[in-house]
A protein has these predicted regions:
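Conserved GNAT acetyl-CoA-binding A-motif
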Residues: 100-112
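A short beta-loop-alpha structural element at the N-terminal edge
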Residues: 2-17
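Terminal substrate-recognition subdomain of acyl/acetyltransferases
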Residues: 138-148
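Conserved active-site alpha-helix within GNAT-family acetyltransferase domains
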Residues: 91-92, 113-130, 135-139
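A short helix-loop-beta-strand connector motif used in the catalytic cores of GNAT acetyltransferases and
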Residues: 41-53
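Conserved acetyl-CoA-binding loop-helix of GNAT-fold acetyltransferases
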Residues: 80, 86-99, 119-123
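Conserved GNAT-fold acetyl-CoA-binding loop/helix
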Residues: 16-43
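Conserved beta-strand in the GNAT
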Residues: 53, 59-67, 74-79
Length: 148
């Protein structure tokens, strides 16, 4: 059974391990999100932003990182450890988080070359609104979902 729980500082190690597992096999150029590469940055996210643990049978298997902004909720990250990808866990967890904010505009960006990520967000009703150039020429797809 999937459960979504607000993360606390003591969750840092299990979230960091899940993030590294989730992005270990990425075929997209680059080294992954900065919170995947830096335990310190992920710790700052836990202290200053809204982070959620995705639990499967009581064990953390993923996470969601949300940066509330004045005009939107910015989804900085969604990840499920490699051993549980493709099971619908991320879709269930993000769907639950979306339901917790019934009147909001959600935004995110993901590598445009990562077709699996793009498909994941589109399945959840996010609309592609454009692209943005990143470091090293990597292109990011911009997404938005309005819930009212």
């Amino acid at each position: 059974m999937i459960e979504l729980r607000r993360a606390v500082p003591e969750d840092l190690d299990c979230l960091f391990e899940a993030a590294n597992s989730a992005f270990a096999g990425s075929t997209v150029s680059g080294k992954g999100p900065r919170w995947k590469r830096s335990r310190e940055f992920l710790g700052d996210c836990l202290a200053e932003q809204e982070c959620w643990c995705i639990l499967l049978d009581g064990r953390t298997v993923g996470g969601l990182i949300l940066f509330p902004q004045p005009d939107c909720l910015w989804l900085e990250g969604a990840f499920v450890e490699a051993g549980h990808q493709g099971e619908g866990i991320g879709q269930q967890a993000l769907g639950e988080l979306l339901r917790r904010y019934p009147e909001a505009t959600w935004r995110l960006k993901t590598p445009a070359a990562d077709k699996r990520d793009c498909h994941f967000y589109e399945k959840l009703g996010f609309a592609r609104t454009g692209t943005e150039a990143g470091h090293g020429g990597q292109e990011f797809a911009l997404y938005e979902k309005k819930i009212f």
